[in-house]
Amino acid sequence: MAQFLTEDFLLDTEFARRLYHDYAKDQPIYDYHCHLPPEQIAENTRFKNLYDIWLKGDHYKWRAMRTNGVAERFCTGDASDREKFDAWAATVPHTIGNPLYHWTHLELRRPFGITGKLLSPATADEIWQRGNELLAQDSFSARGIMQKMNVKMVGTTDDPIDDLRHHKAIAADGSFNIKVLPSWRPDKAFNIEAAGFNDYMQRLEAAADTSISRFADLCTALNKRMDHFAAHGCKVSDHALDVVVYGEADEATLDGILARRLAGNQPSTEETAQFKTAVLLFLSGEYHRREWVQQYHIGALRNNNSRMFNLVGPDIGFDSINDQPLAQPLSRLLDAQGLRNALPKTILYCLNPRDNEVIGTMVGNFQGEGAAGKMQFGSGWWFNDQKDGMQRQMTQLAQLGLLSRFVGMLTDSRSFLSYTRHEYFRRILCQMIGRWVEDGEAPADIELLGSMVKNICFDNAKQYFAIEL
């Protein structure tokens, strides 16, 4: 019987242990997509306590706590920090089998060095006290934790209207050597059906100093803001395509759709598809010209609980997996980009694991141009960011494409403690390849497979994003 969370956690073959300890473990972290607040990095935030750094804003934990019968005031409400931590500690023993159980204890081990103790009501006092003692040290500031975890690059998620002053301040600080770059997230500029679209157009007009009344005006405004992002080192875009749509329209039609929306009229389903397609095609052309990477996160069903949305807002744990078809509209969208000779490097993530093979085969349709792994099937995302989900994604990527060209893991997280997800991913990767060797499905060539693991952990992403570190 294996012990829980030893140095060989998940490494169930000798070959896996060699791969992890000799090739994966000490690789730096290239976290190309996350939701860390750049302000906290710029200001080198010091966290008040374990709640402040660990539970605040964590919708994964809130979902588990609600499922465990914890009242909302202990999740997002007015309970004290310690009361919220205690509610989490009481929930943790019930999360066995959920990735939260592994994540929790990996995060206690690194960076806190708390080992041999499982979080529960019986250990809550000791862990609370020890964690808070460490957080009082300079080395446990936001930047200190990033340095402890050997992070080399972080890509935050930023709106086109953001002024990026925090990124500018970080870049100007010669004492901090981790790249913190903005990523362009223009969802609000193409979600024409959204309630806040007209208000957002006014804010975009102000940020770009451009009046927007026609489709060409919107493109001009977005182009100006992309120039601003490029000046701050941006090389990556990201888009939430909850449902993939495709529709063709000429510019006069697009002008009419935009004018009617700005006048307060809701677009039809067809008009929404036409407008979104046009914006995405314009953007992809700019990404290709600027040599940016585009990411599509596909298939979320958001804000399902209207009562809770009205009480506490979005992004607090009431989202789930969508089941809308995506193959045909996604194919047409990518094909249209290719026909314009404007298909940039692209990473596709699907939230519904049913779509793994759809994405795994779709990326193969558009590879080429002498770029290894130009089109990527992205790592297991959100509800798939767990052992089974990552194994499925990597297995299907290997079967349908080239695992060796995979750009690997990202945290997609708002927490400075989530870097152990890279460790978790690396252990799962080494476990999987080690089992292939054990079963005679891959050669026991440590240099060949070790190099492959090293590339997936760091080097492939470094080469793919082409950002100078």
UniProtKB/Swiss-Prot annotation:
**Which InterPro entries does the entry mention?**
Metal_Hydrolase, Uronate_isomerase
| Catalytic activities | D-glucuronate = D-fructuronate; aldehydo-D-galacturonate = keto-D-tagaturonate
Enzyme Commission code(s) on record? 5.3.1.12
Family statement drawn from the similarity comment of this UniProt entry: Belongs to the metallo-dependent hydrolases superfamily. Uronate isomerase family.
Please give the superkingdom of this protein's source: Bacteria
Q: Looking at the keywords, is Repressor present?
A: no
Annotated GO MF terms: glucuronate isomerase activity
Keyword vocabulary terms for this entry = Isomerase
Q: Which SUPFAM superfamilies match?
A: Metallo-dependent hydrolases (SSF51556)
Organism, as annotated = Yersinia enterocolitica serotype O:8 / biotype 1B (strain NCTC 13174 / 8081)
Report the record's Gene Ontology biological process terms: D-galacturonate catabolic process; D-glucuronate catabolic process
Q: Which enzyme class?
A: isomerase
Which pathway does it operate in?
Carbohydrate metabolism; pentose and glucuronate interconversion
Protein name according to UniProt: Uronate isomerase
> A single Pfam family, by name?
UxaC
